Amino acid sequence: MWEFKFYSRGGQGAVTAAKILINAAIIEGKYGQAIPSYGQERKGAPVYTYARIAEGPIDVKSYVYRPNCVICFDTSLADLGIDITEGVRPGSTLIVNTDDAAYENPAFEKVCVIDADKITHELLGEVGTV
């Protein structure tokens, strides 16, 4: 079973991203869960989202505490004391939204850097400025 933990801020789309990931897994014939964790947070507040993908039925009904993969939408969450390495398994993967192509984190075996903010601005212009 693959377990994912998404770190983001409200409004960045992590809850939607987890749902899309799980829908894609289901289309591929796998089982999946998307588990958002948020309350009255406003836009910009930290949000955690969890997901699981498995070949068979998933009996676990809890947050993800030992992720194989962490997806970080905003590296500035570290400034709030949020530790994206918490509970990661050996050999885990980090997918991180940053413009720092040399971004590294020794807690992860693989680090995949994606400048999603730049891609969004190139495709859509300034987001949220209607």
Q: Where are these predicted regions, by residue range?
A:
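Active-site cofactor/cluster-binding pocket
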Residues: 1-130
